[in-house]
Amino acid sequence: MSAASNPIVLSSSPEHCAPRAAAPTTHDFNEAAAVPSRGSSPESILSPSSLCRLPTRSRYFQKESLSDEPRTENGPPRGPPSKTSERREKREKKVERSISEPAAGLDGVRPPLLPQKANAPKRASGSNKKRGKCSKSETSTNKTLTGRVAKSGSMGSQESDKTATDASQCGSLRQKSPKPSDDGGNNDLQLEAALKRRLDWTPTKDTSIELVDASQEGAKEGSSKGFGDLLAGYSFNNNLLFSKCTSNDTTAEESTEDSQNGDRASEAKRRTKQRTKKFTTLTARVTARYQSDDMHSRLQTENPDGFMESANGNMPKLKRKGTSRSKRQQPEVVILSPEEAVKSLNEQDLIFGTCSQLEREDSPTMIRDLQAAIHESEQNMASQPTNSLLQRAGGGSMSTSTVSRFRAPKSLWSVAARDLDGSLIDAEVVDLTESPSFKPSMANKQVTAGSIPENPPYEEKIRESDSISQPSKRIHNQDEAPKPEASEHTHLSMPNYNDFTDAVLSERVTEFGFKPLKNRRKMVELLEKCWETKYGPSLYINDTSDQQAGPASSTSRVASARLQVPEGQPSKTKESREATKPKTAAGSKRTTKSDANPCTAAGPTRERTKITASGTRLNKPSSITSYRDVEEIEDSEEEIIPSPNRLQNNFRISRSSKRTASLSVTDTSSSPSRMPLSAGLSGVDKRNPSDISDQITRAVRAQSSTRPGTRNCPTWHEKILMYDPIIIEDFTTWLNTEGLGLVREDREVNVGSVRQWCESRGICCCYRRLNRN
């Protein structure tokens, strides 16, 4: 071959890189877009927008094999491929298998090498100068190629081989130095680091909504919270949480749901109102008025559809209703005065009984009916003459049927009104002036107060009976007295009251129904007028036996005369009634005068054992003074101060024994011989006078049995029990005028002895306070 066919090509610019060198790391995107791509040009860097595109050419076109080296026509084949080229092939295969995103890598998206044109070295521009900048290692390798002689026929193949070798060398250099250059071209992309991260893991999508606001301090804390914490922060704050531009379908659905919820709430209210709780125990009945209905308030305040109502704007109304209910559940506490509290306690009705009795009937009228029945039974007990003297005074047939008259169906009320013997408990004071009586044939029948016929012949006989223990044989002995004897005693002589002591005079005054007077002369005049009104005018007799025995004997004689009157002669009964009318008319003025100040009365106002006391009260009903004497349950220990009921029973027994003794003396004394003054008195005066302090104690206890105290005017015994201060002057005056007369004591006491008696028994006493101006 000649030398002309093999020309030598010398590089005109040995210090710069060859035009077929690899592309530099920095590249201007605008200039690269204008320059057409050629096989001899370096590989261009893709723009950020092109990285997101799907690879089309590299995946569907055949790539050039770098291992197949072309052979020259005259020269031998080139050696095996370098290590950098093998590494390049492995990397390309790995990238093709693991690509999942469009920007998976740049080396796998290489376009195929195109054949270089012959006139490529002739083109030179400013952009080529920028791309010509390479590292020193590349320039040194390019310098070895300069000055090489090649044949003209193999020029194109040699140039293509150089281009492939240069590209592989640039790729290996790029792999060995992954750090970006200091010029700042690859700092924004960081392609190698992004490739490694996407091969290792796939990031999850963040569904939490972050509030992009730099002014809020809690933005970072809100992003770290979970979904439940975010929902917990939604609450109604009087602002519309949803926009008004909602669809018509959503509004219609919400309105239908609200109407359904309202219907359910109204049905629940009706159901709760219809339920009525039945009380079966005493505790439930008493505490029912203080229980609060919590179920009704819970159904109205709790609403499960709160969010839906807040969207429609209905929550403020429900909140206002809730506040009003909370106020109703807390009622105002009203503190009553002591008087109102006691009044409400007295008006409160409590029914005690077992559960079986209360469950028998649960009607609302049961309590009212029960109270009406109790009230009616109490009225019947008060109106019926329950004194057992009524049966014993009528004879043997009446005394044998003591309980038969009052026998009724057994119940708790009938059992409670009887004593240990089975008979009804006797009343304390019963005015039998106009009380009816019963025939012997009605003894075994049960009668009421309305069906009792009047039988006047037994009127005086009932008044003269003294006590239960008085034998009936005494009455039969009086019945045997002749009738002329009663006519002899029709004109009785008036006793000489001037010879009586003050105690006896005060006792006789109380027998006629008046209180004792302080003036002795006025008491004598009062007794004389009462005697004349009752028995008519008579002469004075100085016989003391007649003075003492006169009233008692006349009482017995009149009683015997009354008992002998048959039922078919009502004429004497009318006369006896007419005889008692003037006495009442004469004593009416004194009665009104004595009753003007009931609290200052020193003595009892009635005596059921005296005929004169009962004669002055003809028109008083018996139901006013009929009280049940219920015996208290005694304790095992002996009481230091006996109860009023014990004192009353003891005093009643002593009075009956005294009256029995006095009647026996007057009946047996038929001679007009002179007798001592104490013969007609009770047996207490015959004994030796006891200590005056014991007499004071007996007088105080006797007052409570004869005259029960009231709240405004209590007795002396009640005052002592309540530790009220006792005024010594008033107490001494009462003892001298009335108190000692109740126990048949003629002596008088002074202020010093009364004070000594009070101090010895621990009674609070004091003198009257003098008002000094």
Swiss-Prot record:
GO terms for cellular component: Slx1-Slx4 complex. Residues 1-191, 248-331, 436-495, 542-623, 653-691 are annotated as: Disordered. Keywords: DNA damage, DNA recombination, DNA repair, Nucleus, Phosphoprotein. Pfam families: Slx4 (PF09494). It is found in: Nucleus. Residues 61-72, 84-99, 476-491, 572-581 have a biased composition (Basic and acidic residues). Residues 36-50, 660-673 have a biased composition (Low complexity). The keyword DNA repair applies. Residues 1-14, 165-175, 436-449, 542-558, 611-623 have a biased composition (Polar residues). One of its GO terms (molecular function) is 5'-flap endonuclease activity. Regulatory subunit of the slx1-slx4 structure-specific endonuclease that resolves DNA secondary structures generated during DNA repair and recombination. Has endonuclease activity towards branched DNA substrates, introducing single-strand cuts in duplex DNA close to junctions with ss-DNA. Forms a heterodimer with slx1. This is Structure-specific endonuclease subunit slx4. It comes from Aspergillus terreus (strain NIH 2624 / FGSC A1156).
